[in-house]
Amino acid sequence: MPTFATPKPITVSIELSVGDVRIVASDRTDTIVQVRPTDDSREVDVRDAEQTRVEQTPDGLVVKTPRPRGLGLLGKPGSVDVTIELPAGSSVHGDSSVAAFHTSGRLGECKIKTTAGNVDLDETGPLDLHTGAGAVSVTKAGGDTEVTTGTGRIRLGEIDGAAVIKNSNGDTRIDAVTGNLRMNASNGDLIVGRADANVTGKSANGEIRIGQVSSGTVEVKTSNGEIEIGVGAGSAARLDLFTSFGHVRNHMDAADSPEPTDSVVEVSARTSYGDIVIRRA
């Protein structure tokens, strides 16, 4: 079990073919790396764990598993499980073919890419996350965020920054975002609890719901699904709403032009099949 002196946050680079990655960030001055075969009864798993390279660099650590020797009909590749305990605030760069990533504690910048595998993160700094197939869960991202999945649910808590979210097949839910938000889905709902800046959202098939927005511009469009937007108390709204097959329900009180000091939300909402609901948050 390699142990390294790391008195300050580091950068960990992980290259993993197949397996599982767990990272625990806490108030500590060292880093511990544990590499185990996923199944210690499989020779290929044991071999890959033994051949995994763990090296300290000037900026942090590199963890790299060997390349698979067989795929598909040629044989099942080896699988290893990596556990890293490191200082809070450390950055993580992960690249894998088939692997799940799990973190707990506060991390810094995170860049994670996996062809297939779920990603479950606790608290990060700026985040760049891409998975070809897998569910994504993030408790809090402290910086600009980009998340993409080919198929799978996306569940994001607080985003303190701008965000770009792309989901080809699956629902997307965000609790709160402070910066500009851009969302795209081919098949799935787009749900936002609170947006503090501009929002652009488009789904080919799915509902779009924004619980509260108090300023900025909202442009949302879906080909098939209901749209619901809550306008924050004390904010005026300029509305441009259209549905081809459905009803428009505006529960806002009619008013004259807003005062110069009022917050104004400009809403453009389009759906081909579905109702549009505008209400007070």
List PLM regions with ranges.
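Intrinsically disordered, low-complexity terminal regions
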Residues: 1-281
